[in-house]
Amino acid sequence: MSVVSPDPAPVPHDPQRRALLRWLVGGGALAGGLGVSAVAQGYRFGVTHEQWNLVGLTRPVRLALLTDLHYGLYIGAGSVRRWVDATLAECPDLILLGGDLVDSHFDAAARPQQTAALLAELGRLRAPLGVYAVWGNHDYGSFGRSISQSPEASRADWAARRDALRAGLAGQGVTVLLNEGRSLRDDLWLGGVDDLRMGEADSVAALRGSGTRATVLLAHNPDVLLRLRSAPGLVLSGHTHGGQVRLPLLGALKVPADPRFTMGWVRGPQGIPAYVSRGLGMSGLPVRNLCEPEITLLTLLPPGA
């Protein structure tokens, strides 16, 4: 005698369960799509054109500001090549590199080919008034900690890396300014300071000798605006990445500086103007959202022009 199993009981229709499943599947797909988009946004960039009337200037000057390259971990020579090509296409009078040239995980001595590739690309930068750079905290080997918390051997190792990188850059025509300045024209002085947190930033030394010239101070960290002991006509910074990840209505989730100085045109408490670049590279995670990497092409004009 055969036994026929009864049909399984039908699963009751549960609208809430189906809605939850749809939400989970849709939410997962959305999160995945946003993740892919955030990674893609991190590798796109644009050229931002800005103007500023600078006291003391007698004729215009066009400068390009590239900052926060973070070469090494997520950024390779191909990205740097595209940035250099875009910069040269603008034919600036002056090119400035605003620090964090390499990522804190990058060991130049252990990766000589990568280091040579970086120097070769940056060596293509040419401008009538020169190419200048300053150090950022990642050039000190720091990702969010004080240099004083690092072991002595680690600090010595990174000092040697910076010395080697500085010499390599000099060989390619890029001058790193460490609390010093240069007279670029009879009406223009450029000063550059060491990193605010990891080094010893001295704006007075950087602007010493500027006289009556218009003054531009290159400083990686915009928080230098809170500690200035001099009064430059304009400060140019990076460091913040514009927050790197921004959300609609909320803005930046985290800013490694005074939140008043997240990005764009800002003023310090003394009224000194500054432009804070969103930078080009990434740190922490290889993502950006609503915060496109930028090269800033800044035209400085005489007052009233």
Swiss-Prot record:
Q: Where does a divalent metal cation 2 bind?
A: D100, N137, H239
Q: Which PANTHER family does the UniProt entry name for this protein?
A: PHOSPHODIESTERASE YAEI, TRANSMEMBRANE PROTEIN WITH METALLOPHOSPHOESTERASE DOMAIN-RELATED
Q: Tell me what PTMs the record reports for this protein.
A: Predicted to be exported by the Tat system. The position of the signal peptide cleavage has not been experimentally proven.
Q: What residue range is the signal peptide?
A: 1-40
Q: Which organism is it from?
A: Deinococcus radiodurans (strain ATCC 13939 / DSM 20539 / JCM 16871 / CCUG 27074 / LMG 4051 / NBRC 15346 / NCIMB 9279 / VKM B-1422 / R1)
What GO molecular function terms would the record report?
metal ion binding; UDP-2,3-diacylglucosamine hydrolase activity
Report the co-factor binding details: Binds 2 divalent metal cations.
> Can you quote a single GO CC term?
membrane
Required cofactor names: a divalent metal cation
Any one GO biological process: lipid A biosynthetic process
Q: Looking at the record's lineage, which domain of life comes first?
A: Bacteria
Entries under Gene3D superfamilies matching the protein: 3.60.21.10
**InterPro entries assigned:** Calcineurin-like_PHP_ApaH, Metallo-depent_PP-like, Metallophosphoesterase_sf, TAT_signal
Statement: the UniProt record of this protein carries the keyword Transferase: no
Per the similarity annotation, which family is this?
Belongs to the metallophosphoesterase superfamily.
What are the entry keywords? Hydrolase, Metal-binding, Signal
Q: What is this protein called?
A: Uncharacterized metallophosphoesterase DR_2345
